[in-house]
């Protein structure tokens, strides 16, 4: 099976679907690879590097007529016509937003997989190009903001005076938002972030940011792993929060997107006007309509109030080498999934939830939209235990006279024992008493669930007792011999029981369950 990697023709696209490193991995799966000449130049991957990796350098027609075509941007109608019958195209397709492209693909007897339709489940994380590109975009958004911002991000105290740190507000704490939070925080800025999902507050704090919540936050995840649509009441309360925050910050980075829908409007025109001159807004959702009023895709707009609104839609492509490597790795992981035998033979299994969710067209048949894939929710917290209807009565404190009598009697007995006992016995009794105290506090604090493995650990202690008792079996005193025999018997029971418990514990981790003793 031949894999084709054509050059991207979309204006401004700098990424490539395979790098020399990922080409080696594809060859290791049993495929042949042809790369269009010049496909990786913008990503610092010349033709010679692909040739050294084992790929064949060919023309656009050779790449597009391969059995499996790997592409980054949505193909044009002319490129779709180049596909041979029965070919498989893997690319970003935006099927929910571009039904015309779906119809164009269905007019050909080809199969098309959308890399931007990977479900948000743990098994598909290695294929998720949206997360990979969002991570790069969040990082690059901060870099673009720093370039347009006229001051330091970090605060400084210099001989020329004190420089306050920049204040950054990140709207949306998804993959892109978290990347922006971490980058801005590492540059020394004071970072605030908000999201419709209150549970992300801990993630924001872990990256050095401060969570700014909307009063009476609502959880809106839509069951897909992405943020969902919010209510009108929530939007009004969020607008008040944004209006307060943007007046106080220097940089705003918006990342809010809803799959299959236009981007929600978060920052209104009057909010932009309230910001200080020199402030910067990066609208990462400009391609889907924008989160900010006045943002223009692929342009930097400066308002009359001196606020710069950056609407770049190619933020991942502004780091072409890194973006191509991550995109290519996601594609390699998909090809691994489609090649279960690793023999260079492509197998599309529509019973697999990941492959089914990505399949837009199969042999000219439209399979979009796929069945919904629900993300597993976190288990609910167990209900709190109800207090007992009749709490047990508190114990009466011991009588001081009784306590004094017990302590005094014990002291007298201890004095008599030490006065009339040999020094060797006193030393042994002291060690014995200390062992009782230490053992009580150590074993007494062990949780009940750990008592079984504790029996396994005590084999060594019981073994020492057995050895000591065996040394006393030949004593001249009959009493010592009897006590030694009893000690060997009791300690041996503990040893044998400990080994039995250990064997059953280890058997729990075996494929067949607990190990059974053979008859």
Task: Identify the residue ranges that each predicted region occupies.
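Structural/interface elements that position substrates and couple domains in central-metabolism enzymes
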Residues: 2-107, 114-144, 148-164, 178, ...
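Glycine-rich phosphate/diphosphate-binding loop of Rossmann-like nucleotide-binding domains
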Residues: 6-45, 155-245, 395, 416-418
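A structured beta-alpha segment of the ubiquitous adenosine-cofactor-binding alpha/beta core
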Residues: 54-64, 74-75, 222-251, 256-269
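Structural signature of hydrophobic alpha-helical transmembrane segments
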Residues: 60, 422-435, 456
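ADP-ribose/adenylate-binding Rossmann-like module
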Residues: 83-116, 251-310
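Adenosine-phosphate binding glycine-rich loop
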Residues: 116-118, 122-160, 165, 286, ...
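Phosphate-binding loop/pocket of nucleotide- and phosphate-handling active sites
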Residues: 347-418, 519
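Small-residue-rich segments of transmembrane alpha-helices in multi-pass membrane proteins
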Residues: 460-470
């Amino acid at each position: 099976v031949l894999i084709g990697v054509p050059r991207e023709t979309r204006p401004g696209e700098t990424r490539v679907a395979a790098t020399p490193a990922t080409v080696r991995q594809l060859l290791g799966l049993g495929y042949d690879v042809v790369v269009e000449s010049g496909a990786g130049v913008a990503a610092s991957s010349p033709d010679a590097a692909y040739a050294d990796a084992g790929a064949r350098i060919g023309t656009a027609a050779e790449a597009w007529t391969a059995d499996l075509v790997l592409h980054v941007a949505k193909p044009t109608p002319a490129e779709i016509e180049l596909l041979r019958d029965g070919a498989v195209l893997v690319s970003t397709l935006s099927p929910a937003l571009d039904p015309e492209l779906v119809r164009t693909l269905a007019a050909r007897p080809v199969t098309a997989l959308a890399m931007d339709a990977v479900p948000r489940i743990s098994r598909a994380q290695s294929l998720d190009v949206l997360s990979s590109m969002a991570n790069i975009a969040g990082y690059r958004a901060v870099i673009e903001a720093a370039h347009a911002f006229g001051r330091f991000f970090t605060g400084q105290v210099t001989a020329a005076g004190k420089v306050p740190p920049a204040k950054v507000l990140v709207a949306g704490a998804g993959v892109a938002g978290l990347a922006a939070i971490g980058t801005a925080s590492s540059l020394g800025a004071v970072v605030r972030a908000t999201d419709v999902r209150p549970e992300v507050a801990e993630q924001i704090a872990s990256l050095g940011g401060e969570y700014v919540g909307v009063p009476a936050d609502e959880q809106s995840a839509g069951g897909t792993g992405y943020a969902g649509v919010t209510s009108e009441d929530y939007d009004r309360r969020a607008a008040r929060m944004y209006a307060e925050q943007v007046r106080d910050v220097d940089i705003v980075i918006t990342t809010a997107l809803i799959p299959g829908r236009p981007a929600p409007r978060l920052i209104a025109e009057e909010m932009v006007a309230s910001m200080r001159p020199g402030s910067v807004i990066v609208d990462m959702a400009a391609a889907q309509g924008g989160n900010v009023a006045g943002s223009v895709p692929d342009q930097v707009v400066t308002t009359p109030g001196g606020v710069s609104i950056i609407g770049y839609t190619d933020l991942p492509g502004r780091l072409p080498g890194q973006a191509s490597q991550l995109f290519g790795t996601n594609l390699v992981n998909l090809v691994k999934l489609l090649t279960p035998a690793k023999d260079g033979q492509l197998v599309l299994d529509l019973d697999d939830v990941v492959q089914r969710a990505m399949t837009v067209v199969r042999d000219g048949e439209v399979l979009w939209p796929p069945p919904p894939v629900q993300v597993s929710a976190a288990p609910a917290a167990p209900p709190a235990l109800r207090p007992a209807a009749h709490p047990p009565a508190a114990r009466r404190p011991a009588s001081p006279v009784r306590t004094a009598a017990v302590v005094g009697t014990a002291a007298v007995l201890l004095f008599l024992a030490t006065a009339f006992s040999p020094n060797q016995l006193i030393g042994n009794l002291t060690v014995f008493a200390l062992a009782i105290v230490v053992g009580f506090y150590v074993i007494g604090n062990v949780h009940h669930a750990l008592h079984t493995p504790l029996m396994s650990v005590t084999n060594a202690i019981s073994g020492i007792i057995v050895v000591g008792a065996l040394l006393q079996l030949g004593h001249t005193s009959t009493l010592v011999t009897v006590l030694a025999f009893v000690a060997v018997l009791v300690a041996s029971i503990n040893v044998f029981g400990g080994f039995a418990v250990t064997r059953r514990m280890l058997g729990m981790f075996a494929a067949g369950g607990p190990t059974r003793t053979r008859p």
